[in-house]
Regions:
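Conserved thiamine diphosphate
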Residues: 8-69, 237, 242
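Residue-level signal for secondary-structure boundary elements
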Residues: 11, 71-74, 202
Length: 243
């Protein structure tokens, strides 16, 4: 806690610039020891910054921003996205936008845009997600051409609330996707904020989908798949919200 508060309490006189890289996420039947997602725990530590890239280019740009930040930055790295080891994550392999670039902390990106015609007819859904959730959403969106817009948060803290609320107001239907169990999660807090800030623009309650609410991820690969999200589960939830 001292490290996270140092820059703030000293008014910038004692910055603590450090990068803490944390491999996270379920991959390869790691069970309860190596498969957890911890963004909800970390997001309650005031003073630290948290990034969660979904592709290689974002990883580099966010790491460089973290290097220059005067506060501790935790970089969450999903193990299944290393070399796109998990089927359906080919989009994690991207070409660098430039030889030297920095992605500002707290700046989300549109990973997939909905078609203007669908937006004008009120037939779209806004998906807010990050990390592996981006790839589940991208694959699930293939079932609803032009109807899905996906916001890749890239940063857990600071959070790009402006982009979140703008998307919610534009589309009227919102689905928040996380790998964590939903109860008491960071994703659920996003849904609550959207509901509070954008209520008059919503056509349906904000929905959150994540892993089953179990104490730990099973060692069994079969049970692991049953507990975790997948593109198929996300697609089914998209259909429910779209009606």
């Amino acid at each position: 806690t001292e490290v996270s508060r140092s820059c703030y309490l000293s008014n910038g006189k004692w910055p603590v610039s450090c990068i803490i890289r944390v491999p996270v996420g379920a991959y390869g039947s790691g069970g309860p020891y190596h498969s957890s997602s911890v963004e909800s725990v970390l997001s309650n530590i005031r003073g630290i910054k948290i990034v969660y890239p979904s592709n290689g280019a974002d990883m580099k740009g966010l790491m460089k921003a973290a290097y220059h930040d005067p506060n501790p930055v935790v970089v969450l790295e999903h193990k299944g996205l290393y070399w796109s080891k998990v089927k359906g994550t080919e989009a994690a392999k991207v070409v660098e936008p430039d030889g030297d670039y920095i992605i500002p902390l707290g700046k989300a990106r549109i990973a997939l845009a909905a078609s203007k015609d669908r937006v004008d007819h009120g037939q779209t859904l806004f998906v807010v997600t990050y990390g592996m959730g981006v790839h589940w959403a991208l694959n699930a969106a293939k079932n609803y051409p032009g109807q899905i817009e996906i916001l890749d948060l890239r940063c857990i803290a600071p959070l790009d609330e402006e982009a979140i609320y703008a998307g919610a107001e534009k589309h009227g239907r919102v689905l928040v996707v996380t790998e964590e169990p939903v109860n008491s999660s960071f994703a659920q807090s996003i849904a609550a904020r959207i509901q509070q800030q954008c209520f008059k623009f919503l056509d349906a309650p904000v929905t959150t989908i994540g892993a089953a609410n179990l104490p730990a991820i099973p060692l069994s690969e079969v049970l692991e798949r049953e507990m975790l999200l997948s593109a198929e589960k996300v697609a089914a939830e998209m259909g429910k919200v779209l009606g």
